[in-house]
Amino acid sequence: GREMSRHQEIFKLVEGLIQDNKGSDYEVSLDLDLRKDLEVDSVDLMEYIIYLEEAYQINIPDKDIDAMATVGDMVDYVLKKTSK
């Protein structure tokens, strides 16, 4: 339903951010580990976060960023924050 398509929309946005960084043929999945698989450093991660904050008009505190392990965590978090 609507949640699923919102989830998909957020995922596509995150996927686009990652592919801008890693190359357009980079395969992004929900269980990719942000730090291990993506080797995202804190600067890249902050760029993603700031982009998401602006795109969805939300605020993501540092402790929540630290708690995000995978791409899926990031997508779920944004979904939760925006579906109030």
Task: Give residue spans per PLM region.
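Short active-site alpha-helical segment characteristic of glycosyltransferases
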Residues: 48
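Phosphopantetheine carrier-protein modules
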Residues: 19-39, 56-67
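Thiotemplate assembly-line natural product biosynthesis machinery
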Residues: 4-27, 79-84
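C-terminal structural segments of small proteins and small subunits
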Residues: 67, 72-83
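Two-component histidine kinase catalytic core, primarily the HATPase_c
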Residues: 44
